[in-house]
Amino acid sequence: MNKEFFEALALLEKEKGVVLEEISMCEDTPEDLTHELLMLAHYGDQPVARPILGSAEQISAYTRDDLAAYWGAKYHPQNAVLSIAGNYDWARVQQMIGEKLGAWSAENYRPRSDATQPAAPGCLAKDKEIEQMHICLGFPGLKIGDAQNYELSLFNSVFGGAMSSRLFQKIREESGMAYTVYSYPNAYTDCGMLSVYAATNPD
């Protein structure tokens, strides 16, 4: 996020319009909306449960000062990664880093200390006037760096991660109960979830 962006109010208003359109598109895409509802149901009132795009009300209300304050609070050297590849002069790169980023302050950096926990088991539903019923199930998974992530990836491939998976073969090919059905793992820094999705006729 380039700090100079905050100086151009016209650009901010333009980008807000783009994000509002993205939010509307998600609301009109049942599959996307179902995954968002699953995150809310599984993680409850925790940051990871919130939609990445935010809400239309939040986006409309944001000001330049709001974004500048967020940038100052969240973007620090301690949580940044600088990646360099190709034919370069390391001494020159170091010099440029010092020139461009040397004054980047870490004074107000506060690392997150709270761990994300799944909410109590429950169900979240939203009625929409559409032809299909979209269903998502969530189960506790593994966080990033867990040694068993390879096993979970293999399990997911067999269970529901491909057209040859058991979910796909049983529910779509054999039973004809749904056209779309799959599973997938999500891994975050301190939590994870294994999800199953299907779209079918309510009858």
Q: What label would you give each PLM region?
A:
Residues 109-165:
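His/Glu-based metal-binding/catalytic segments typifying zinc-dependent metallopeptidases
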Residues 1-109, 125, 136, 142-143, ...:
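Charge-rich, well-structured scaffold segments of protease-associated domains
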Residues 168-169:
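Phosphate-proximal small/polar/acidic motifs at interfaces that engage nucleotide phosphates
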